[in-house]
Amino acid sequence: MNMIEKEVAVKDLVTKSNLPASDYVINPYVGCPHGCRYCYACFMKRFTNHSEAWGSFIDIKRCDTPISKRKLQGKSVFLSSVTDCYNPFEEKYRNTRKILEQLISINCELNISTKSHLILRDIDLLKQCNNLKVSVSVNTLDEQFKNDMDHASSIMKRLETLETLHQNGIYTVLFMSPVFPGITDYKEIIVKTQRYVDEYWFENLNLRGSYKQDILGYIKSACPQLVELYDEIYVKGNMRFWNNLAVEIEEYCAAHSIKHINYFYHKELVEAKLRTK
């Protein structure tokens, strides 16, 4: 698919965050070419006046105003919430690198999330960040399933990226997101990667909006043995599977001294944060 790319002027790259673990968020782009079938960020079209399908366009943000050091000093900053800041267009436009060049002089807690090995291009800057975590999304070791779900870097490249970052002294997080019931084998992933991963994050698959029927249709055709389970969770709304899995993950990580955070109840965490504002 040919991407529609456009440069757009913005007043500020930094916005307040409703995410439970960050104060501010920076999205260098609007849109993303990864084409993740489960992407929650497709809701952004409502605010950007795009008629094109999500995954078919990318806006490259241009901002003449430097990032405010005073605003971010001592705060937590997330790159990025509704795009992959290292999507393939970053190689051409270098927005994320320019942002990092400003952030390295700010005493803030920086979290970068990506599915791309392109982040290794900026390892020189990453090593200058004093309080940095880099999370790479991996929810399967099956390349075919990954290819069915997104167009981002291969699983092999993502794992190599985590290992290279770890070897360079950068704090690594494997973000197991989204966890697909009956498909994501969290133990298998941990066993394979624990040597070079400092922390694991877990987030469950939420199905809503335009992509719900697409994913349920995929399960019906590719994994018919899981149809009953998905119907129980996503049609009937039974949370028992997630409650049981959360306990199981907690017990496994405790038994193996694995540092982790469970974001299964992300919606509840966001709502709790909003109530404190």
Per-segment meaning from a language model:
Residues 1-133, 141-144, 155-156, 167:
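Conserved Radical SAM active-site core
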Residues 2-9, 15-16, 187-277:
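Auxiliary Fe-S-binding modules of radical SAM enzymes
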Residues 76-78, 109-111, 131-135, 171-175, ...:
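Structural preference for beta-strand elements that scaffold enzyme active sites
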Residues 82-84, 115-117, 137-141, 177-179, ...:
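Active-site beta-loop-alpha junctions enriched in small/polar residues
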Residues 85-87, 143-151, 171-177, 236:
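Surface-exposed cleft-lining segments at the edges of enzyme active sites
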Residues 104, 166-167, 194, 254:
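Anion (oxyanion) recognition and catalysis
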Residues 152-164:
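Glycine-rich S-adenosyl-L-methionine
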Residues 164-184, 236-239:
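Conserved strand-turn element in the central/C-terminal portion of the radical SAM core barrel
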